[in-house]
Amino acid sequence: MKKIILVAGGTGGHFFPAVALGEELIKRGYIVHFITDLRCKKYINKDMKIIFHILNLKRFSNIFLFLPILSITFLKSIRLIYNIKCCVIIGFGGYPVIAPMFAAIFLRIPIIIHEQNSYLGKVNKFFARFAKKIATSYEDIKNLPEFAKSKIVLTGGIVRKNIRELDSFMYSVSQHSLTKLTQTALTNTFNPLVKGRNDEFANSNIFTIFIFGGSQGAKLFSELIPASIKILMKKQPSLELNIIQQAALDHQVKIKDIYSKLNITYEFAEFFDNIALQYKVANLVISRAGASTIEELTYIGLPAIFIPLPSAADNHQYYNAKLLEDNKAGWCLEQNNISSEKLADKILDLISNRQLLEDASQNLLNRKKEGHVLLSNLIEDTVFL
């Protein structure tokens, strides 16, 4: 059986799309090895049929610390990849792929890179000259060298299996959430301890906002959004609102106090183990604009207000969100220019003009691709034909 190596790490946003690709390749009869770093070790599930290898490559701002570690990891990568005897290596960008990709070049093994963002990252830009193909999630990639344009293949984003399973649900804001979601399923979705949780919740008049900001910028979300909701409810006191929000434990008490006084239902979590459950009942998402988030929302057609993380590498989150906004598939509010008043007005505008949400949902679905399938096809066409 032919062997393929995937290389991804650093964050779950790189790790999970690579896993989804690996699962598709295994279905096609390949043996899949996955090289990742210590940060992603926590995501590895023993039920996965992928063979994992952990390399210790950390990000250092000091080049004199980084180079010795890179050299050691490069030698380990050469030994590992040589022993695996793979046919191709797929890199997903980010610093953890540097040593294995250099090793692949040294061993003359074909490489394909996947760029999840609308802005070609530094690592992928460097390896683009050595890659057979560059698979992309977007049709318009910024920071792309002229020589690399002929290598571009639009495969779309790669989405986790549990999100792909939502494909049978169709977004409809007029029916509260996804049209095939029954009241029983809706009730079972939520923690029974959620404030205000009862059978009335499935009423179509309730508008649900799902808010998640990841570990970076959590403080902003915990302060900005409750203030915006307070303004929103003052402007529209009859609004039946439900909030599902990611928030750190030390922020939850203060936010609960605000929401309780506004008489709205709410649910909090530091981390959502299966985010598909929250997607199911949301009318609108407020989130950062990381590649995985955008890919998942695109796949199920769930509209969002994006607040890009300003410190993201190469400001790629802004470019991701702006591309969707330019295609009327979402809304981009920059953190440096946002205020609670502006956010409240945007939410109210969408609630008052729900056709905007329906249109954005359809525009998202128009961009949807089966990325795990298309990239697998590209690998086979490029390497094995």
Curated annotation (Swiss-Prot):
**Job description of the protein:** Cell wall formation. Catalyzes the transfer of a GlcNAc subunit on undecaprenyl-pyrophosphoryl-MurNAc-pentapeptide (lipid intermediate I) to form undecaprenyl-pyrophosphoryl-MurNAc-(pentapeptide)GlcNAc (lipid intermediate II).
By its UniProt entry, which SUPFAM superfamilies does this protein fall under? UDP-Glycosyltransferase/glycogen phosphorylase (SSF53756)
Q: Which BP terms does GO give this entry?
A: carbohydrate metabolic process; cell division; cell wall organization; lipid glycosylation; peptidoglycan biosynthetic process; regulation of cell shape
What organism does the UniProt record list as the source? Rickettsia prowazekii (strain Madrid E)
Where on the tree of life does the source sit, at the highest rank? Bacteria
Q: Which reaction does it catalyse?
A: di-trans,octa-cis-undecaprenyl diphospho-N-acetyl-alpha-D-muramoyl-L-alanyl-D-glutamyl-meso-2,6-diaminopimeloyl-D-alanyl-D-alanine + UDP-N-acetyl-alpha-D-glucosamine = di-trans,octa-cis-undecaprenyl diphospho-[N-acetyl-alpha-D-glucosaminyl-(1->4)]-N-acetyl-alpha-D-muramoyl-L-alanyl-D-glutamyl-meso-2,6-diaminopimeloyl-D-alanyl-D-alanine + UDP + H(+)
How this chain sits in the membrane, per its record, is: Peripheral membrane protein
> Which keywords appear in this protein's UniProt record, sorted alphabetically?
Cell cycle, Cell division, Cell inner membrane, Cell membrane, Cell shape, Cell wall biogenesis/degradation, Glycosyltransferase, Membrane, Peptidoglycan synthesis, Transferase
Which enzyme class? Answer: transferase
Note the InterPro entries from the entry.
GlcNAc_MurG, Glyco_trans_28_C, GlycoTrans_28_N
The molecular function GO annotations come to: UDP-N-acetyl-D-glucosamine:N-acetylmuramoyl-L-alanyl-D-glutamyl-meso-2,6-diaminopimelyl-D-alanyl-D-alanine-diphosphoundecaprenol 4-beta-N-acetylglucosaminlytransferase activity; undecaprenyldiphospho-muramoylpentapeptide beta-N-acetylglucosaminyltransferase activity
Answer whether the UniProt record assigns the keyword Signal to this protein: no
Quote the protein name from its UniProt record: UDP-N-acetylglucosamine--N-acetylmuramyl-(pentapeptide) pyrophosphoryl-undecaprenol N-acetylglucosamine transferase
**Subcellular localization:** Cell inner membrane
**EC number, UniProt record:** 2.4.1.227
What Gene Ontology terms describe where this protein resides (cellular component)?
A: plasma membrane
- Identify the pathway: Cell wall biogenesis; peptidoglycan biosynthesis
**Which annotated residues bind UDP-N-acetyl-alpha-D-glucosamine?**
11-13, 117, 160, 215, 317
Q: Is the keyword Transferase in the record? A: yes
Q: Which family does it belong to?
A: Belongs to the glycosyltransferase 28 family. MurG subfamily.
